[in-house]
């Protein structure tokens, strides 16, 4: 398979759908689907804010579905549609600014301004996505947050970017 023809968003979609498929292989439960959705919230937000907002109420209604396989099929289709929208700098910036808020109680105003400037520099195309991601991951190590640490966004995007820059892709 020639992976060079895949863009970063396509690779993210492959990783995300593979993980979703493995849920079904290992015995599908409502809890597993809700955990998956929670882990992928920032990935989804980076791909399509409108589709992300549509998916939320559907997920909230999971307990109203008697047939979990039917729910899974509908959920998977909605995830496919959502992830078919390539992530873009505007939506990444939205995610990064949202995450910045988690550190507000922990970092001083100078650090907040520096992170905001780095995110804005990424938005303007002056820095790669990896620059604000690495700063945020640094803050995540200093000020752990269970929800942020569980977000696949902070694992998948650096993995794809590193593969691309290492010459593997």
From Swiss-Prot:
It comes from the Bacteria. InterPro entries: DUF1722. Pfam families: DUF1722. This is Uncharacterized protein YbgA. It comes from Escherichia coli (strain K12). The lineage of its organism: Bacteria, Pseudomonadati, Pseudomonadota, Gammaproteobacteria, Enterobacterales. The gene is ybgA.
